[in-house]
């Protein structure tokens, strides 16, 4: 599988980020992080039960997860694979958020998943950057008005977070944006 790791130099990088989160060895600052819905999908093979057990590390947790997936799949094996598929970044982000919450750390977590027009690639890794920096017009994809609305709001969230440590605030028209 895909493995991404930092180069630990003990000058700037003192350990793998998730290990540092687990040990509560991160700076005491509010974080904002998230992922796109279609990046680095982990898709089970034909042995969905074995895949889930390996992923979760325990038969009990795998069964709990697959029970939910099977209910949503309604007996369709292809749909079960789809329901059981997960985003690798999503699971890591949610685990980090859970650990941070147990340590009393403040954070904001988002999931980015609008339909991205063009080649049906979904909300792929880094597709959120065009929106965060309001650079949709520099892309070849045929974005429409609602994409520009999403972009404006995302840029506002990030700007508010940079200014105040809290992404929540008002839109350009003075209307409060949905709270994160």
Regions found by a protein language model. Give the residues of each.
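Mature extracytoplasmic/periplasmic domains
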Residues: 97, 164-180
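Substrate-gating cap/lid region and adjacent catalytic-acid/histidine neighborhood
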Residues: 1-148
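Non-catalytic, well-ordered alpha-helical segments in soluble enzyme domains
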Residues: 147-170
